[in-house]
């Protein structure tokens, strides 16, 4: 009986760890991600939206140029970008702008010196 209880507990933990991936979006949040925000803050503008449900069908409420606005969503691959512990001494150089610029399962991630394609972090 004890072994069955441990197996059941293990199965529940395994299934529970996958729930955020399936049910991780908030109500009203659209699939996809926000495009990168490289623009400097030029002036203070009020937010055009607070959440995705305030945007037309194919747009998401994203932070861009220092305020939230409805922008076309971009596809996002599974996994998260690894942390970068380095500091850049040269000007930033972007080798990608969005996940779809990268081959296979690689993600377009911020690095010390710009964005580049990297394998997702294991976690």
From Swiss-Prot:
Function: Putative acid-stable proteinase inhibitor.
MF GO annotations: serine-type endopeptidase inhibitor activity
Protein's cellular compartments: Secreted
Biological process annotations from GO: antibacterial humoral response; innate immune response
Residues spanning the signal sequence: 1-24
Any one GO CC term of the record: extracellular space
Protein's gene: WFDC5
Organism: Pongo abelii (Sumatran orangutan)
Residue pairs linked by disulfide bridges in the UniProt entry: 34-62, 41-66, 49-61, 55-70, 81-109, 88-113, 96-108, 102-117
InterPro entries: Elafin-like_sf, WAP_dom, WAP_four-disulfide_core
Alphabetized PANTHER family for the sequence: WAP FOUR-DISULFIDE CORE DOMAIN PROTEIN 5 (PTHR19441:SF39), WHEY ACDIC PROTEIN WAP (PTHR19441)
Keywords: Disulfide bond, Protease inhibitor, Repeat, Secreted, Serine protease inhibitor, Signal
Descriptive protein name: WAP four-disulfide core domain protein 5
UniProt keyword annotation of Magnesium present: no
């Amino acid at each position: 009986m004890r072994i069955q209880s441990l197996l059941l507990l293990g199965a529940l933990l395994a299934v529970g760890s996958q729930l955020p991936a399936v049910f991780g979006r908030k109500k009203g949040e659209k699939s996809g991600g926000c495009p990168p925000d490289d623009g400097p803050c030029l002036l203070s503008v009020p937010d055009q939206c607070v959440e995705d449900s305030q945007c037309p069908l194919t747009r998401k409420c994203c932070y861009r140029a220092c305020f939230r606005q409805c922008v076309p969503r971009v596809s996002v691959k599974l996994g998260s970008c690894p942390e970068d512990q380095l500091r850049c001494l040269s000007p930033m150089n972007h080798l990608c702008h969005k996940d779809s610029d990268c081959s296979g399962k690689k993600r377009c991630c911020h690095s010390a010196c710009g964005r580049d394609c990297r394998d997702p972090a294991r976690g």
